[in-house]
Amino acid sequence: MKGLGTLFLLLTACLASRADDAATLPDIQVQENFIESLIYGKWFNLAVGSTCPWLRRIKDKMSMSTLVLQEGATEAEISMTSTRWRRGVCEEISGAYEKTDIDGKFLYHKSKWNITLETYVVHTNYDEYAIFLTKKFSHYHGPTITLKLYGREPKLRDSLLLEFREVALSMGIPENSIVFMADKGECVPGDQEVKPSPHLRARRAVLPQENEGSGSEPLVTGILKKEDSCQLTYSEGPCLGMMERYHYNGTSMACETFQYGGCLGNGNNFISEKECLQTCRTVAACNLPIVQGPCRAYIKLWAFDAAQGKCIQFTYGGCKGNGNKFYSEKECKEYCGVPGDGDKTN
């Protein structure tokens, strides 16, 4: 019941993660009630997350590949065939993954490196997508992990790409090591690329914007604008962690806290109230009352005073405010359309 984890393995020329993280991953949770037969068939590898230095060096050359899983030669195996572009030539790789006593966990032996990889199907709905995690130990890199996203079709919903990014980050995989594959189309083994196109480069997850003002370019994660997720109902996700995160509440026009489980969920999920507000707040926030909140943090911020028609400084208590709260005078004026050249910061 771990066929998908297998595909994960064949593209693991570089499995990675921080050594100290991978060493503490003995209890990886596989897909609940995993059904092996439903994982069979064709999958497209659409994204990968890894901290392996080698992968980071070649990520611009990576492109979508396919993987076919089916019954193996024996009941103890799953057959795998992967097709991908490699160095301008369409390459096909076949192998077998060994089942274990845990449904959803597979082993794959790399004779070239004399190592055994462990692959786990951590989340799937079988007919649309699957997320696999692979662990490896090598004398060169030490213990490592790699996370991969597969789809039944060459394209997936943008929300799933965001969810994959969140899972990868929660596993300790750096933002610059999350790669969304370029789609060069399927290939026939032995075919050669006609002409590599510069624009067909791997899509990278983009770091959240750091600009204080709200007039900068929209935040983008992978291929989806983060602000497109602001109207989603927040999701704790299926995991059991208790991380305090912020979500945007369109009714109250405020960013509120919730407990995030640590995986999946959706894009309405922010590490800080500031990031949440600067991504999701609208100009309607300028008409809200100025709220200090019940907490006593005494943070100097800016808000728009509708009665005076200008931005003023106020003391924010640190909790239970609303969207009429800005981190510089310039940001307040940009949002609320106040003329002037003030540029004071808190």
UniProtKB/Swiss-Prot annotation:
Residues 1-19 form the signal peptide. 3-hydroxy-L-kynurenine binds at residues 52, 110, 136, 148. Keywords: Cell membrane, Chromophore, Cleavage on pair of basic residues, Cytoplasm, Disulfide bond, Endoplasmic reticulum, Extracellular matrix, Glycoprotein, Membrane, Mitochondrion, Mitochondrion inner membrane, Nucleus, Oxidoreductase, Protease inhibitor, Proteoglycan, Repeat, Secreted, Serine protease inhibitor, Signal. Pfam families: Kunitz_BPTI (PF00014), Lipocalin (PF00061). The record marks 240-241 as: Inhibitory (P1) (chymotrypsin, elastase). The precursor is proteolytically processed into separately functioning proteins. This is Protein AMBP. Residues 230-280, 286-336 form the BPTI/Kunitz inhibitor domain.
